């Protein structure tokens, strides 16, 4: 096996499934999501002459850290994504920022074929739990003090989610602020060890921090989001940021990096605060000035937690924004319009 494809068994197995899917397709239009399904969509288009729509939730050229996880499979995922995108009838970007990234990564794409349709959420899934809802037991189980002002992070332990930067920023955050980290599913043992080391140092210095490594059941996560005071998203790569929408649907103000599609979700000064971040253009998204990014993040956290009444107003504004602009009903209508346009071109 070529050196470039070492550790690529996982990707090759995915391609095997893609071949089976492509052979069985019997549809008027194909809609594929992520590189895992892109090859199936591309092959089905060639086999059955069926128009192909792809929704871009992320881009392999902008996630070079995935090589840590996929090994040689990253070369295969990158190849599959590129070929599928360049032969698709439409590519849906989940944000305007993502559309720009798509055209940068794949300049051979016709810009007219790349359209924006945001992701959405089902608001009913994020309603305030009843007082006797068992989800509230999460606070007791993890010794989370509901009387303390509490900041919440929810995300996988990956390079793109920016958790190491948050752990650095928390050294400069008011120690009276309780911090809850729902962080698990590390991409690699290396990044898990990095996070463990940073957490241990932080816990020794400031304390008042709870790390939940397991994936919480939805009722418990919903109760946790309704029981905290603010949400933090330190991502360095985020095509849209569903996690922020979910927090807003629970009425939480959000502090988030001003990267990718996040500024299309979080309105600075209205639904929370955006943390400015200048980034390298080498695909990694690494902040050009990590110290500034860390200190600006800490400052935004301190500001939002220092004014509970303003934080509540921001949380209410965020709830209304999530409800009014990111409902699945409106997004479904926009997606159907994409299908209709593609099919009309075939007539």
Regions found by a protein language model. Give the residues of each.
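A conserved mid-protein helix/loop that constitutes part of the nucleotide-sugar donor-binding site
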Residues: 149, 153, 158-172
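Carbohydrate-associated surface elements
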Residues: 97, 120
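Nucleotide-activated donor-binding/catalytic signature segment of Leloir-type glycosyltransferases, i.e.
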Residues: 183, 192-215, 219
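Aromatic "clamp/platform" in nucleotide-sugar-dependent glycosyltransferases that forms part
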Residues: 236
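A short helix/loop element that forms part of the nucleotide-sugar donor recognition site in Leloir-type
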Residues: 127-144
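Nucleotide-sugar donor phosphate/pyrophosphate-binding loop at the beta->alpha transition
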Residues: 50-53, 61-83, 100
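Short hydrophobic beta-strand element within catalytic cores of glycosyltransferases
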Residues: 253-256, 266, 273-274
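Short alpha-helical donor nucleotide-sugar binding micro-motif in glycosyltransferases
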Residues: 222-228
């Amino acid at each position: 096996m070529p050196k470039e494809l070492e550790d690529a068994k996982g990707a090759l197995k995915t391609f095997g499934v893609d071949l089976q899917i492509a052979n069985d397709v019997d549809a008027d239009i194909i809609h594929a999501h992520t590189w895992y399904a892109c090859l199936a969509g591309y092959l089905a288009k060639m086999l059955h002459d069926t128009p192909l729509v792809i929704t871009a939730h992320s881009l392999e050229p902008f996630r070079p850290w995935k090589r840590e996880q996929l090994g040689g499979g990253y070369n295969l995922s990158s190849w599959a994504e590129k070929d599928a995108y360049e032969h698709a009838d439409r590519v849906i970007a989940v944000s305007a920022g993502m559309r720009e990234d798509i055209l940068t990564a794949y300049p051979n794409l016709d810009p007219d074929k790349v359209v924006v349709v945001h992701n959405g959420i089902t608001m009913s899934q994020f309603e305030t739990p009843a007082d006797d809802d068992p989800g509230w037991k999460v606070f007791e189980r993890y010794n989370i003090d509901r009387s303390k002002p509490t900041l919440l992070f929810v995300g996988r332990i990956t390079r793109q989610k920016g958790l190491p930067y948050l752990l650095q920023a928390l050294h400069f955050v008011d120690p009276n602020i309780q911090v809850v980290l729902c962080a698990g599913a590390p991409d690699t043992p290396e990044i898990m060890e990095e996070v463990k080391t940073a957490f241990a140092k932080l816990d020794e210095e400031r304390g008042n921090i709870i790390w939940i490594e397991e994936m919480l059941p939805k009722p418990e996560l919903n109760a946790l989001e309704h029981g905290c005071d603010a949400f933090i998203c330190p991502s360095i790569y985020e095509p849209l940021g569903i996690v922020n929408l979910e927090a807003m649907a629970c009425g939480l103000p959000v502090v988030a990096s001003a990267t990718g599609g996040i500024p299309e979700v979080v309105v600075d000064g209205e639904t929370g605060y955006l943390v400015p971040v200048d980034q390298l253009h080498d695909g990694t998204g690494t902040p050009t000035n990590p110290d500034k990014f860390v200190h600006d993040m800490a400052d935004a956290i301190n500001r939002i937690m220092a004014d509970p009444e303003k934080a509540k107003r921001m949380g209410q504004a965020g709830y209304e924004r999530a409800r009014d602009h990111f409902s699945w009903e409106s997004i479904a209508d926009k997606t159907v319009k994409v299908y209709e346009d593609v099919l009309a071109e075939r007539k």
